[in-house]
């Protein structure tokens, strides 16, 4: 079982685009890859993270789970919809049902590392622990990112979990001093596995495939086990 969890330091940092780019790069590296999004909110506004992953990455082994209409944190969204939340056991089981020998299963969280996903307060950190998964952190290049990233790394280390690296999810076309300095500082915190350009999610599938292949090191993807 090879499970890689993807979290972000904030909303809007590019988790879904990063998930799609990683899945695309893994497909190009000839890995058997699946993407799992156990909890999705905001479906009333047309949010469909797995649909976006499919469109951009060309990966078809996609597995959803619990979906809630309003664009809120999962517990709030479920409460307002009058819908049940999954338990920790159900969430872990949903990912294990997707994984297979030799497969890389990418699990995209909802919100950040410690956002409650289930009825019992289970978080993506808990799922990573139960699944023996490393965690890839998607970060912003802007001000505040160093503190947010350090806090997320500390939260992983406190539970003995391994960080697979960082991805800068939306690198500006014209970075300023803050972005350039932050990029150097982020590289000192953890390996930066990829830097994706801002607006990458609007690219055509062909263009997205090219930028995904260029962004991620195929040897690193192959080594994930």
Curated annotation (Swiss-Prot):
EC category name: ligase
Annotated metabolic or biological route of this protein: Cofactor biosynthesis; biotin biosynthesis; biotin from 7,8-diaminononanoate: step 1/2
Cofactor(s) of this protein: Mg(2+)
Pfam families, per database record: AAA_26
GO cellular component: cytosol
Reaction catalysis annotation: (7R,8S)-7,8-diammoniononanoate + CO2 + ATP = (4R,5S)-dethiobiotin + ADP + phosphate + 3 H(+)
Entry-linked InterPro entries: DTB_synth_BioD, P-loop_NTPase
Keyword field: ATP-binding, Biotin biosynthesis, Cytoplasm, Ligase, Magnesium, Metal-binding, Nucleotide-binding
One GO MF term: ATP binding
Annotated residues for binding of ATP: 12-17, 49, 108-111, 197-199
Family: Belongs to the dethiobiotin synthetase family.
Protein function: Catalyzes a mechanistically unusual reaction, the ATP-dependent insertion of CO2 between the N7 and N8 nitrogen atoms of 7,8-diaminopelargonic acid (DAPA, also called 7,8-diammoniononanoate) to form a ureido ring.
Subunit structure: Homodimer.
The protein's name: ATP-dependent dethiobiotin synthetase BioD
Gene source species: Mycolicibacterium smegmatis (strain ATCC 700084 / mc(2)155)
Biological classification of the source: Bacteria, Bacillati, Actinomycetota, Actinomycetes, Mycobacteriales
